[in-house]
């Protein structure tokens, strides 16, 4: 279990004296050039590094690995993550809808 993106932004704001509350950005920068962009890029790149580290670790144990990235925040990371991934922000909703359709057709 790892803190999510919004929790990371909130923690930097809530537990420091003066860091602003930032949110996700799709702009890809190596380093921020202001406090706001540094907070944003720090959170975003930290998550990318964490995910890529997990993928690398699992890939060493299992040669064939498929990575599926879901959830509302997935859209912010698809272009940032270098490993081949499948991303669908609405995968859970689509799955639940298929279950609903399946159960409706059984009756």
Spans of features found by a protein language model:
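Glycine-rich phosphate-binding loop plus the immediately following alpha-helix
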Residues: 1-39, 45, 99, 103-106
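Alpha-helix N-cap/helix-start and coil->helix boundary motif
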Residues: 6, 74-75, 93
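Short, well-ordered secondary-structure micro-motifs
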Residues: 10, 78-80
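Adenine-nucleotide phosphate-binding core of ATP-dependent small-molecule kinases
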Residues: 25-66, 76, 84-86
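GST superfamily/GST-like fold recognition
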Residues: 70-75, 100
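Conserved phosphate-binding/catalytic loops in two-lobed NTP-binding clefts
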Residues: 82-106
């Amino acid at each position: 279990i790892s803190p999510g993106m919004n929790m990371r932004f909130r923690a930097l704001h809530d537990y420091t004296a003066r860091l602003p509350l930032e949110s996700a950005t799709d702009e890809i920068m190596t380093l921020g050039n202001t406090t706001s962009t540094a907070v944003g890029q720090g959170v975003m790149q930290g998550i990318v590094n964490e995910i890529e580290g997990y993928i690398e670790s699992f890939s060493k144990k299992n040669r064939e690995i498929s990575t599926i990235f879901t959830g509302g925040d997935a859209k912010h990371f698809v272009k940032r993550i270098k490993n081949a991934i499948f991303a669908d922000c609405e995968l859970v909703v689509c799955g639940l809808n298929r279950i609903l359709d399946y159960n409706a057709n059984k009756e």
